[in-house]
């Protein structure tokens, strides 16, 4: 591991961008059913792998977490196009989620979307490797 002691870094992205928070709430303790509700190997990880392989879709980067994933997008238009294009994996994953879960309340899902205007944010990191916006954008001292 690199020596990160005393290291202060910042991050920036050129132009406006979108921060997309998405997560799940486990309302049941049936772990296997919950993982299956969220799509298993054909769920979020599958979509993120697809987006990384297709940078023209507009995903700038993401940070995995439980239960929340932070995604950075070039624009809301890019995010919305991905969400609604039947040729991209989201539409099928979304339909399959509702088919599996239906009216069951085992697993809840949510998202929040924020438009960030160029220069109207701050991203500072202490004793950290590139993380969050620092992975999606430019990392500097």
Placement of each model-derived feature along the sequence:
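Tryptophan-centric aromatic hotspots in well-structured domains and transmembrane helices
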Residues: 72-74
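Short S/T/G/P-rich N-terminal loop/turn motif that feeds into the first structured element of a domain
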Residues: 1-65, 81, 105-141
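An amphipathic, aromatic/His-enriched active-site/gating alpha helix that lines ligand/cofactor pockets
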Residues: 76-109
């Amino acid at each position: 591991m690199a020596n990160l002691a005393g290291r202060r870094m910042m991050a920036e992205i050129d132009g406006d961008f979108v921060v997309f928070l998405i997560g799940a709430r486990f309302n049941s303790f049936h772990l296997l059913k919950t993982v299956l509700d969220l799509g298993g190997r054909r769920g979020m990880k599958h979509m993120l792998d697809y987006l990384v392989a297709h940078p023209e879709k507009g995903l700038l980067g993401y940070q995995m977490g439980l239960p929340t994933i932070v995604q950075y997008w070039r624009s809301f238009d890019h995010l919305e196009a991905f969400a609604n294009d039947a040729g991209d994996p989201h539409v099928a994953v979304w339909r399959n989620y509702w088919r599996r879960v239906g009216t069951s309340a085992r697993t809840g899902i949510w998202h929040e979307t924020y438009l960030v205007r160029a220069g109207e944010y701050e991203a500072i990191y202490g004793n950290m490797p590139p993380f969050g916006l620092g992975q999606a954008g430019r990392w500097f001292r």
